[in-house]
């Protein structure tokens, strides 16, 4: 490469925003880029990553940084043998084991037990390796599992740290373990209290002699009782064990508990880790100080070169039974012997010992102590005594004891080590595979709220910067030490919390695994902490709150998609978080943004100082446009965003439907809702009185009251209080349906009840006038006043002023109920405005009263209302799933709500019909994730798994009324490995229900299959021919049969047997059709005369290939044509020949001619083959005649039901039959009309056809009134179903028939809606054979995906 190409100007950098998934160092400033904030830019030429601010400086100041182009790819191969080097490089940066990392971890000692002991003993509260080490692209599964267990098991499973050692330890170490095991005994608690009292008395009386008194007290009470030996092996604390001992390759480290923490002279912020240089300096200072004070004797033997390496860090130790500091008087004669015994590689050396004291000195010694600290902070240090601060942290076991089990803090440090390692892995696809296990993900997510609760329990205090106050007053000393310890615990916990939420945040980058995050409590845990974020102000960083906000945005993104909508809707606190986020950031995340050009404003309907309402047109619909002015009185963006978010989150048939809002770059925002032309309730009822001269009918008022009560019941179920229930906030549309509006003053129920007086005085409850806290019963009181208005058409308190009205209501006064109101309604109104709030009924109870008025108990117990029958029968529920995309769902009707409820129950509850629903959804997402890891070449050769396609339902999509794109796309087939051993059709799932659906395997027709004896060739050709014309199918079938006859005579003999069986099968099919006609159940919407492709799908569904004959036949009515898996040859031959026989129903003469021609060809080849083929033809003729008789019976009974389109199809068939003659004289199959890829019709794919037609089918539906109403359904090429009660064809391009599925690049076209029918078979595989008799009158037309 030339030099001028190497040195390119800075303008050649192509900076683009980059989302960090690992720790990165900026190329310019060489500082760490925080992965949480995502403030990074990447140059796609040189692949270097910079801070955003550094990129701006490069561009503005025109800094000439060299862009070397794409870097060379260096392939790094990691092996299991390199993992010890990984741990060694990670922890060699630690200040604790600078000189001992080589001895601890190597290839010989790399075991999980060694890592467990090593990592547990480590203390890295504030270590340097956090900024130095890199991220790792290797993670062995065994090590990953161990680290996860190290993080979670001590909090999720075990209350304390318990380590099992493989071999016996040293005797002195066992004694130390005995001290820790007996730490919580009651006897030692009493000893601790006695020692505390003795220390207080001794400190007050003899301050100058306290050092000697403490030594005597310890020697008499602690050392003698516990046989504590003074040797070097006692230095077993996590902070000093590696500084005191040199471990051999097979040495075992003891996990002992250190319960007294030395004051760090080097750094006030780090009192838990010690470096080698700090240890040497401190040891020399202690030696000088001990010689100066003459507190201990020391040997004069010179120290060797390794004495600093093996010298003892003279920290004082204390078990949890002692409250005072423990002074270690170490004998010189025992030090070298024990050191040599424990460390074989160490040389004999003498160690100078010191006595560490805890003193409370006089003012004179205070000044001296202050002078020492002054010099310690300078460059030249003078010897000084070490002040040991006693640990006084509240114990989780016994808070009153003021003691602290160091296992908690020790455990947190262990967690931090594991979290640091986990935080440093590259969160790429290779490493994320380990997180697909819910066994690890769920406990890791649950751990975060546990750590947050501990963080909240810690009370922060000011740091103790003045040591003089500690020495003057013992009580102040204890409290300040408590604050210091709390601050230390808070610092340690805050690091763990930040690491853990950063790990969870990186997982959320993989949106393919979103279903997994809803299941394994990742989203639930973060949302739970976010709901209590006010109490965490000051304890969590800004980056952590940004991660919580990201989860809220994720909930808003998936709110309109099923099944997430049902999951989110069941959590009112999640909806509350979405609303609070919209209010806080002044942004709407649930509504659809509408521009001003998309709406057409017509006339003004209503005007007030707050807003102006216009009637208009949006997307071809009559809508109401509620416009605000930013300069208007009382306008507030916070209230505006709150209203549109609550309306978007509260979509219900009885709540005003919101189509979107205009909020960006405008001074006059507006909200687009459905138009209610009749105005408010009072206006609509008064209009009846004016036009008819009579009061409104009571049944009409009851129906309107039911609508109003249903809307309030819905918002109360979401923990919303409307707070302004009045007649003007209920609008009536053209169909006399009541809709609830005006959520501007609504709010979600919080932990504390509200005291703010909000509402209209005429409707306000008495507790609001009294200033008492109010809850949802306040809306019930207001609704009682609305009922009084509806049944009296009058205004309450019209003769009273506001003050008189308030006093009247507080004293128990209510409006008078006239006798014209029915008694039941009058009693209901009186119960709604009872003075005591908790005695008022709920809206569920109110609705029961109204329902009893409309639908009294029937005399005959078998006469059940149609709604009850509809939603209590699992079979009918499955049938309704076929119509998921009709206008009923678009309008959010009762069926939609119930269906979504059933879907939610199938996800969240254990039911037999939905037992594997969510599990299969998880498998789909995991399979998609693993499939994306494959290279393009590997994907082509991959036969085990493929990428599922995202498909979700949008029941409440803001733009659900927009026009639908009817573009047919060819989709690749998917084959997902299913671990469940269920039925044969377990690979087909409801794509409209499952967000990640997969299709069945694709059958490819290759040239090598032409001469194959397998019957699959017949099946393939038959299926492919369905998309073109039927006569060519017969030719291809006959040609293929000729090939088989020429190859093998036995093949023809088997076909003869199968054809004989087909005679009985077709006879059964004809009888079954006759029975269906007698029962007035239209098996096919065309009156029995159907095209060949539809009769194919029908006959294949009704094939009695196994013992579940009735189940299979019923499945043919409920589901589309399905390509079953290839079983044994006999079964396949039966099904294929049966299809061939049914294809002959329309054109028997042509089929016979084709058969004769093919037989002539066979005679020229082989006489034996000719005989076999003649037998085949004879059997086929018999079968065809039998089928012709059956079809004649059907056609004679249904001649009047033939539609215009069917007549055209018949004429077209006749034309095709006349023009279709066998042109292929050879024995090769005719493949001109055979498609290359045959897609399973169970999935949302459509077969391309030469002509586009619109067919109409008549479906009989029982409406509960005792009559059968015929609904006309129209299905166009895009699979759009529309209904029209007038039995007239309407425009297929009209907007009112559009589907509610949002189109995007990642979501494929759904195809025919009836493809949802595979759900029936997966949900209820064993349907009762008598179901058609039970659901008389409920017959639904089957629409095949291949039609």
Curated annotation (Swiss-Prot):
EC numbers: 2.7.11.1
Keyword presence, Nucleotide-binding: yes
InterPro entries for this protein: C1-like_sf, Kinase-like_dom_sf, PE/DAG-bd, Prot_kinase_dom, Ser-Thr/Tyr_kinase_cat_dom, Ser/Thr_kinase_AS, Ser/Thr_Kinases-Pseudokinases
Keyword tags: ATP-binding, Kinase, Metal-binding, Nucleotide-binding, Serine/threonine-protein kinase, Transferase, Zinc, Zinc-finger
GO term, biological process aspect, one: regulation of actin filament polymerization
Start-end of Low complexity biased regions: 286-316, 333-342, 350-361, 464-485, 1004-1015, 1024-1062, 1128-1241, 1282-1291
Binding-site list for ATP: 605-613, 626
Family per record: Belongs to the protein kinase superfamily. TKL Ser/Thr protein kinase family.
The name this protein goes by in its record: Probable serine/threonine-protein kinase DDB_G0288147
Protein species of origin: Dictyostelium discoideum
């Amino acid at each position: 490469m030339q030099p001028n190409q190497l040195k390119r100007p800075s303008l050649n950098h192509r900076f683009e925003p980059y989302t960090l998934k690992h720790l990165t160092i900026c190329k310019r400033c060489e500082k760490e880029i925080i992965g949480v904030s995502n403030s990074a830019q990447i140059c796609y030429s040189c692949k270097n990553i910079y801070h955003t601010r550094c990129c701006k400086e490069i561009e503005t100041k025109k800094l000439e940084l060299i862009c070397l182009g794409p870097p060379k790819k260096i392939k790094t191969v990691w092996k299991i043998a390199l993992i010890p080097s990984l741990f060694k490089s990670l922890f060699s940066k630690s200040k604790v084991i600078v000189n001992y990392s080589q001895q601890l971890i190597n290839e010989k000692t790399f075991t999980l037990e060694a890592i467990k002991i090593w990592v547990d003993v480590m203390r890295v509260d504030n270590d340097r390796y956090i900024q130095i080490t890199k991220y790792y692209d290797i993670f062995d599964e065994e090590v990953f599992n161990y680290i996860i267990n190290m993080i979670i098991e001590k909090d999720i499973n075990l209350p304390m740290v318990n380590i099992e050692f493989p071999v016996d330890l040293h005797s002195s170490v066992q004694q130390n373990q005995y001290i820790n095991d007996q730490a919580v005994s009651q006897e030692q608690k009493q000893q601790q209290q006695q020692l505390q009292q003795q220390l207080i008395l001794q400190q007050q009386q003899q301050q100058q002699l306290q050092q000697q008194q403490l030594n005597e007290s310890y020697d008499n009470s602690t050392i003698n009782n516990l046989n504590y030996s003074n040797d070097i092996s006692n230095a077993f604390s996590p902070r000093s064990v590696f500084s005191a001992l040199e471990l051999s390759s097979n040495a075992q480290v003891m996990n002992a508990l250190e319960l007294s923490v030395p004051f760090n002279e080097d750094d006030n912020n780090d009192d838990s880790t010690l470096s080698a240089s700090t240890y040497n300096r401190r040891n020399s200072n202690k030696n000088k100080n001990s010689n100066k004070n003459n507190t201990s004797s020391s040997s004069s033997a010179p120290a060797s070169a390794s004495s600093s390496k093996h010298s003892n860090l003279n920290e004082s130790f204390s078990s949890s039974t002692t409250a005072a500091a423990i002074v270690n008087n170490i004998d010189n004669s025992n030090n070298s012997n024990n050191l040599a015994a424990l460390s074989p590689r160490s040389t004999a050396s003498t160690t100078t010992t010191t006595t560490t004291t805890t003193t409370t000195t006089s003012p004179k010694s205070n000044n001296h102590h202050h002078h020492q600290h002054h010099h310690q902070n300078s460059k030249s240090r003078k010897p000084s005594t070490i002040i040991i601060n006693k640990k006084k942290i509240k114990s989780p076991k016994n808070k009153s004891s003021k003691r602290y089990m160091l296992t908690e803090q020790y455990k947190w440090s262990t967690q931090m080590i594991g979290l640091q390692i986990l935080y440093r892995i590259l969160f790429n696809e290779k490493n994320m595979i380990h997180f697909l296990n819910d066994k690890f993900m769920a406990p890791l997510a649950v751990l975060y709220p546990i750590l947050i609760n501990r963080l909240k329990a810690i009370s922060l205090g000011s740091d103790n910067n003045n040591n003089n106050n500690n020495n003057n007053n013992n009580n102040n000393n204890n409290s300040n030490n408590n604050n210091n310890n709390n601050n230390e615990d808070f610092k340690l916990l805050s690091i763990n919390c930040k690491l853990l939420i950063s790990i969870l945040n990186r997982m959320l980058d993989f949106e393919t695994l979103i279903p997994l995050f809803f299941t394994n409590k990742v989203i639930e845990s973060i949302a739970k902490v976010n709901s209590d974020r006010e109490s965490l102000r000051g304890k969590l960083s800004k980056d952590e709150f940004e991660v919580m906000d990201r989860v809220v945005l994720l909930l808003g993104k998936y709110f309109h998609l099923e099944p997430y909508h049902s999951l989110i809707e069941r959590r009112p606190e999640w909806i509350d978080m979405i609303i609070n986020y919209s209010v806080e950031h002044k942004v709407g995340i649930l509504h659809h943004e509408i521009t001003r050009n998309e709406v057409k404003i017509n006339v003004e309907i209503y005007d007030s100082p707050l807003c102006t309402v216009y009637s208009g047109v949006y997307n071809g619909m009559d809508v109401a446009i509620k416009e605000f002015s930013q300069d208007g009185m009382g306008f507030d963006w916070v209230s505006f965003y709150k209203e549109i978010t609550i309306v978007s989150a509260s979509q219900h048939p009885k709540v005003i439907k919101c189509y979107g809002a205009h909020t960006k770059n405008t001074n006059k925002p507006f909200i687009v809702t459905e138009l209610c032309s009749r105005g408010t309730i009072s206006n609509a009822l008064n209009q009846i009185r004016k036009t008819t001269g009579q009061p409104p009918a009571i049944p009409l008022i009851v129906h309107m009251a039911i609508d109003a009560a249903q809307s309030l019941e819905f918002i109360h179920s979401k923990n919303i209080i409307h707070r302004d229930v009045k007649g003007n906030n209920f609008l009536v549309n053209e169909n006399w349906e009541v809709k609830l509006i005006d959520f501007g003053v609504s709010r979600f129920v919080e932990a504390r009840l509200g005291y703010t007086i909000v509402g209209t005085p005429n409707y306000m409850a008495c507790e609001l006038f009294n200033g008492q806290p109010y809850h949802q019963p306040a809306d019930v009181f207001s609704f009682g006043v609305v009922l009084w208005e509806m049944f009296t058409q009058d205004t309450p308190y019209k003769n009273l002023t506001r003050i008189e009205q308030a006093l009247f209501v507080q004293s128990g006064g209510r409006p008078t109920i006239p006798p014209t109101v029915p008694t039941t309604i009058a009693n209901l109104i009186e119960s709604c405005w009872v003075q005591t709030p908790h005695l008022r009924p709920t809206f569920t109870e109110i609705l029961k009263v109204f329902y009893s008025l409309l639908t009294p108990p029937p005399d005959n117990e078998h006469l059940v209302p149609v709604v009850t029958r509809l939603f209590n029968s699992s079979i009918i529920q499955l049938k309704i799933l076929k119509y998921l995309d009709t206008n009923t769902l678009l309008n959010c009707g009762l069926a939609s709500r119930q269906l979504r409820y059933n879907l939610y129950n199938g996800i969240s509850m254990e039911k037999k019909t939905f037992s594997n629903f969510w599990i299969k959804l998880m498998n789909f997402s995991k399979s998609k994730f693993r499939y994306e890891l494959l290279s393009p070449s590997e994907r082509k050769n991959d036969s085990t798994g493929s990428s599922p396609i995202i498909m979700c339902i949008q029941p409440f999509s803001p733009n659900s009324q927009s026009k639908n794109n009817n573009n047919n796309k060819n989709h690749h087939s998917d084959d997902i490995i299913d671990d469940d051993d269920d039925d044969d059709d377990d690979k087909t799932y409801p794509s409209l229900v499952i967000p990640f659906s997969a299709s069945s395997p694709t059958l490819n027709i290759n040239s090598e299959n032409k001469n194959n004896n397998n019957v699959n060739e017949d099946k393939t050709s038959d299926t492919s021919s369905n998309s073109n014309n039927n006569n060519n199918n017969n030719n291809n079938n006959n040609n293929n049969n000729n090939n088989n006859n020429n190859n093998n005579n036995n093949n023809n003999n088997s076909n003869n047997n199968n054809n004989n069986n087909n005679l009985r099968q077709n006879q059964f099919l004809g009888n079954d059709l006759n029975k269906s006609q007698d029962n007035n159940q239209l098996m096919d919407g065309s009156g029995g005369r159907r095209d060949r492709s539809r009769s194919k799908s029908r006959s294949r569904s009704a094939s009695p290939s196994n013992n579940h004959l009735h189940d299979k036949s019923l499945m043919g009515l409920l589901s589309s044509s399905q390509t079953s898996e290839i079983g044994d040859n006999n079964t396949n031959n039966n099904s294929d020949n049966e299809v061939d026989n049914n294809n002959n129903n329309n054109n028997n003469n042509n089929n016979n001619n084709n058969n004769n021609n093919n037989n002539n060809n066979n005679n020229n080849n082989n006489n034996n083959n000719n005989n076999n083929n003649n037998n085949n033809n004879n059997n086929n003729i018999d079968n065809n005649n039998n089928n012709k008789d059956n079809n004649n019976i059907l056609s004679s009974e249904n001649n009047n039901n033939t539609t215009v389109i069917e007549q055209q199809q018949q004429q077209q068939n006749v034309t095709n039959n006349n023009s279709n003659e066998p042109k292929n004289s050879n024995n090769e199959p005719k493949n001109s009309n055979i498609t290359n890829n045959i897609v399973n019709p169970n999935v949302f794919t459509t077969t391309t056809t030469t002509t586009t037609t619109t067919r109409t089918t008549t479906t009989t539906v029982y409406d509960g009134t005792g009559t059968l109403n015929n609904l006309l359904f129209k299905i166009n090429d895009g699979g759009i179903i529309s209904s029209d009660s007038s039995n007239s064809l309407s425009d297929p391009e009209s907007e009112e028939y559009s589907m509610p599925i949002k189109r995007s690049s990642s979501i494929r076209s759904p195809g025919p809606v009836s493809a949802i029918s595979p759900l029936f078979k997966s949900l209820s595989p064993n349907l009762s054979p008598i179901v058609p008799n039970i659901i008389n009158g409920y017959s639904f037309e089957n629409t095949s995906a291949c039609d």
